[in-house]
From Swiss-Prot:
The keyword Hydrolase does not apply. Its EC number is 2.3.1.1. It comes from Aliivibrio fischeri (strain MJ11) (Vibrio fischeri). It is an enzyme of class 2 (transferase). One of its GO terms (cellular component) is cytoplasm. GO terms for molecular function: L-glutamate N-acetyltransferase activity. Pathway: Amino-acid biosynthesis; L-arginine biosynthesis; N(2)-acetyl-L-ornithine from L-glutamate: step 1/4. This is Amino-acid acetyltransferase. It is found in: Cytoplasm. InterPro entries: AceGlu_kinase-like_sf, Acyl_CoA_acyltransferase, Asp/Glu/Uridylate_kinase, GNAT_dom, NAGS_kin, NH2A_AcTrfase. Residues 299-431 form the N-acetyltransferase domain. GO terms for biological process: L-arginine biosynthetic process. Belongs to the acetyltransferase family. ArgA subfamily. It catalyses: L-glutamate + acetyl-CoA = N-acetyl-L-glutamate + CoA + H(+).
């Protein structure tokens, strides 16, 4: 008897919108040396190969930090740090080149695998490395000569894009040459950040030891604006002690993610290299699994406050007059303001929606959904829906329902199904207006 998996079918179908959204998008992936040394690395390579087969344009930047520490210990060579950057003298540079070359070959070999009965079967991936990054020395700081430690001077974006257009994966390490023919040791996080910025990448992805950025309670923060990420980074830096005075891999990548987003990279993702399938879950599921640092926008999605009532009234009044929304008084809005989420642009409320929980039935109502006429050509309705879904999940609710007279098809497109009045919570059934005859739709499995 053949094995059948409805979960596989369901997951595959749910991933389809993300497959379409990510196709032909440029992604820079940062693989620190810790990720390469982890037992899960083979699975990470398999997932990167899968992204390549789905049409993503992939640049990989790898690091060498733990491998370098091990080699320095073996050779009993001391390579001190200054302001968090290793001073790379001639002997240290030779060791860095040795490790970087070895890891480049190892990663290339992994990506070249195409054995039957493996996830890489039939992949036939071309991996391209080269002098796409030109370096320059860091120079002298506070009387300390960084020697062969360097920074990115320029990047051959045209050359990289030609390789990506051919569906090749571009693989780059922390060692780059200069216009004088010298080699320099660069911070791999800086290389990845600069590549994402100068390639106008759609995403910068970093594999870290933690599953994203955690708040003070140890909970994963799903999304951060650069300003929020900066506050967290400053807090983490203050917690560093003399015994543990170096930035962690997560902190270094978070710093790069902030810079990338400020420079125009729409999204940077922090995920764990320890968890099997983290990359796929982050990119191809609604909730993701790690932390996203997203570009700040003139539009802000936030919880409504009492001062927003005037703006909400201005937004919903025309819809109430048309009979699309049930009329609400200012007094009612004042009582319910905590239930509202709004999208604000330059001080104007351009969209709103409210969430009314019914915890006994494990349900919540999405009500008073309105978008300003000038802003209905975007995805603001979807943004509000996603925010309310997340809130409902926080309340441990499993279903979201809506009553509508005009937007039946839009809600069905978002996964809602039409039901009869008996599916409503008992309190809502008693208030249902049979003359208005609103359509009832339910979204299950939040």
């Amino acid at each position: 008897m053949k094995f059948r998996s409805t979960a596989l079918v369901k997951g595959f179908r749910q991933s389809a919108p993300y497959v379409n959204a990510h196709r032909d998008k440029t992604v820079v992936i940062m693989l620190g040396g810790e990720a390469i040394a982890d037992p899960n690395f083979a699975n990470i390579v398999n997932d990167i190969a899968l992204l390549n087969s789905l049409g993503l344009r992939i640049v990989i930047v790898y690091g060498t930090r733990p491998q370098m520490r091990s080699l320095l210990k073996q050779t009993e060579h001391h390579a001190p740090f200054h302001k968090g950057i290793r001073i790379t003298d001639e002997q240290t540079l030779e060791l860095v080149k040795q490790i970087a070359g070895q890891l480049q070959l190892d990663i290339t070999a992994r990506l070249s695998m195409s054995l039957n009965n493996t996830p890489m079967a039939g992949a036939q991936i071309n991996v391209i490395s080269g002098n796409f990054v030109i370096a320059q020395p860091l120079g002298v700081d506070d009387g300390i000569d960084y020697c062969h430690s360097g920074r990115v001077r320029r990047i051959d974006t045209q050359g990289i894009n030609r390789m990506l257009d051919q569906q090749s994966i571009v693989l780059l390490g922390p060692v780059a040459s200069s216009v004088t023919g010298e080699c320099f040791n660069l911070l791999s996080e800086d290389v990845a950040t600069q590549l994402a910025i100068r390639l106008n990448a759609d995403k910068l992805i970093g594999f870290c030891s933690e599953q994203g950025v955690l708040n003070e309670k140890g909970q994963i923060l799903a999304e951060l604006f650069p300003s929020e990420a900066e506050e967290i980074l400053q807090r983490l830096e203050k917690e560093l002690t003399p015994e543990n005075g170096k930035l962690t891999g997560t902190m270094r990548f978070l710093k790069g993610a902030i810079s990338a987003c400020k420079a125009g990279v729409p999204r940077s993702h922090l995920i764990s290299y320890k968890e099997d399938g983290a990359l796929i879950q982050e990119l191809f599921s609604f909730d993701g699994i790690g932390t996203q640092v997203v570009m700040a926008s003139s539009e802000q999605v936030r919880d409504a406050e009492i001062d927003d009532i005037g703006g909400i009234l201005d937004l919903i009044r025309p819809l109430e007059e048309e009979g699309i929304l049930v009329r609400r008084s200012r007094e009612q809005l004042e009582q319910e303001i905590a239930q509202f989420t709004i999208i604000e642009k330059d001080g104007l409320v351009i969209a709103c929606a409210a969430l009314y929980p019914f915890p006994e039935e494990g349900m919540a109502e999405m009500g008073c959904v309105a978008v300003h006429p000038d802003y209905r050509d975007g995805d603001r309705g979807v943004i509000l829906l996603n925010r309310l879904r997340a809130k409902a999940k926080q309340y441990k609710l499993s279903q979201l329902f809506v009553l509508t007279t005009r937007s039946l098809h839009w809600f069905r497109e978002q996964g809602f199904i039409e039901v009869d009045v008996s599916h409503l919570p008992m309190k809502k059934q008693k208030l249902y207006n049979f003359q208005r005859k609103s359509k009832i739709l339910v979204l299950k499995g939040l």
